Amino acid sequence: MKITNETRELLSNLAGINKNFLFKRGASQTSINHSNSIYMDANIEFDMTAESGLYELYEAGVYDITKVVAGINSLECPEIRFSENSLSVIGGDTEMIFALTDRSKLKVPTKTIKFPDLIDCKFELSSNKITQIINYAKTVYGSTKSFLTGFVLIVGDGRTINAQVQESHRTANDVLKINLGECDQTFRFMVSVDNLKLLMKDDYVVEYSPKHLCRFSCKSKKTIYYCSTENID
C-alpha cells in the first residue's frame, strides 16, 4: 500500500498520542493516550493483505509506531506491506522491517466512544487560535519534552464565547483571553493545553457534553478527537 501525504500526516499525529498502535482492517484507526484523556479516530484504510497474498490480517500491532513513521518520512514514495509477523516500509531498494506485537502488550483502545446525544454547546475553533493558545502556554508557563503546562477555560454567556488560558485549574494570575465568536448558549468547561497540542493542525467543530467530554471534529479531514474535560465544579 502506497503512503499518501495525508496518511503520513495522520500516522504522525497518531504517533504523537501514543507510540503503541494497532493497524486494523477497515477505515477506522484509533489511538488513546496513556492517561485516557484523549482518543483519536482517524479515517485511514490500510490494505491488510499479507505479503503472500493468501490471507488478510484482521489487525497488526506495533509497539513503537514512531519508528515506523520515521522510516516512512526517510523514504521517497514509501509503501507499507504486512506479513504474518512483521510490517515492512519499502521505498526503492530499501526495506525496513518492524516486528509485530500482540495487542495484549499494547495500550490501545478496547472500545469505540459513543458521544452523548445531549450537548451544551457547539462552536468552531480555528487552527490559528489553537496555535495561539499553545504558543502562549509554552512561553508564559513553560513546557517539558512530554508535557505542556496550562488549561483553557471556555465560557459561553449567552452572547459570546471566550477562552481564557491559565496556569492551573484555580489560579488565574497571568492569563490570555481570546474571543471565539457569538453564541446563544450558556456553558462553562475546561480542557488542558497538553491535550490541545495533540490535535492535528486544522480548523475544528467543537461540541461539549455535560458528561465531561468534548468532541473535536476536523473540518478538512475525516478525523475526530474525544477529549476529557477538567473538573471545575
Protein language model features and the residues they cover:
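DNA polymerase processivity clamps
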Residues: 1-99, 118-233
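Long, charge-dense
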Residues: 103-123
